[in-house]
Structure formats: C-alpha cells, structure tokens
Amino acid sequence: LPEWTPLNWEELNRFLERVIAAAHPIPIVLYNPPYAQKILKPEEWSEISARFPALIGIKVAGGDATWHEEMRPASNSLSVFVAGTQLASGLVHGCASGSYSNVACLSPKGACEWEQRMRSDPEIALQQEAQIQNVFADALSPFRQRYSNTALDKALATSGGWAEGLTTNVRWPLSKIPTDEIESLATQFRAGLPFLFE
C-alpha cells in the first residue's frame, strides 16, 4: 500500500483495483509496512481478501496472540508473512505462513535452521525468538531513528558476514550505517545469538 499517505477506504479499494489490473494474470502480495500511514486491521484484511481474490498474500508487522486470532479469517484466503523476529510465535501459535526475514538478512543458514526448529522443537524456537527480539532491539536501537529499514537490513547482512563483498551501501537518497559500526554489531549478534551462526 502507499505508505506516504493514509488512504481512506474508497481510495484503498481504487488503488488495489488498479494494481491488480496491472498485474493480471499474476496474483499479488501486498506490503503494509509498520511505518505506513495506514495500518490495516485484521477485519479490513478479511474484507479486502474477500473482494480481491487476486490478492494472495500480505507482508505485515505481525502482532500478539489477539492479533493472530483476529487474523485467522483473513488467513484462510491469504498467506500472512510477518517480521522474521516474530516468526516462531506466528507459526507455532498464530496464523503466519512465513516471514520476510530480517533474521535471514543476518544469517540465511541460521534462519532456515531456526525455522526447521519451529516445527521440530517449538518450545526452544520460541525461547530463541525472545533472544532474537532482545538482541535485535539492543543492537539496532541506536540506528532505528536515524536510518531506514533498508539500511538496517544491509547492516544486518554485512554484520552476518555470510557472503563476500557485502557492504552497508544503500541506494540514493538513503543514508548507510557507517562501516565502522559493523564490527560491534557483528560481535553483539554472534555473542547474543550463537545458534544462528553454528
């Protein structure tokens, strides 16, 4: 959804009609980021999914147990992708289908193994989710107000060190997290989340 202005219901429907027509016959996945001017409620997702069958998935921040319960009707017709830091609770107790994963930015292999653990040992995966949330909050809090989510994801990938040549560079006009912050971030993530780097 357009994130720069809060659409009213009529505008939102008009936007979806045009996007779906332009994408036809390919179905769409809609991103409603947590920083958008309008965050759709679970009942609104249910109404939209009933009206637009070409909408097959959504990328949203996720929520608590109440949010997941309220999202269940919409999740019958939509794949619900939540933030990677909420994937275990979303899969184990909620209606999540998967995630757009900031955890995978940090460690793709670790994120895959953690997702497998959600199915094989959900209690451990839920404990690890709490660790992930705490470490991410502590490590990234100095940067959240000054840098975009894109810059944070690039810093996560660079800190993870899982591929040669990764840098914190982002496209103009975004600002990058300074390269000299990466060593400290990498140390925090590896010390706090060793199971993602085994």
Describe the residue ranges of each PLM region.
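C-terminal alpha-helical cap/extension of soluble enzyme domains
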Residues: 95-96, 107-198
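Aromatic/hydrophobic pocket-lining residues that form the small-molecule binding cavity
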Residues: 12, 16
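Active-site-proximal beta-alpha loop/turn segments in soluble metabolic enzymes
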Residues: 1-3, 31-34
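Catalytic alpha/beta core domains of metabolic enzymes, predominantly
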Residues: 18-26, 33-146
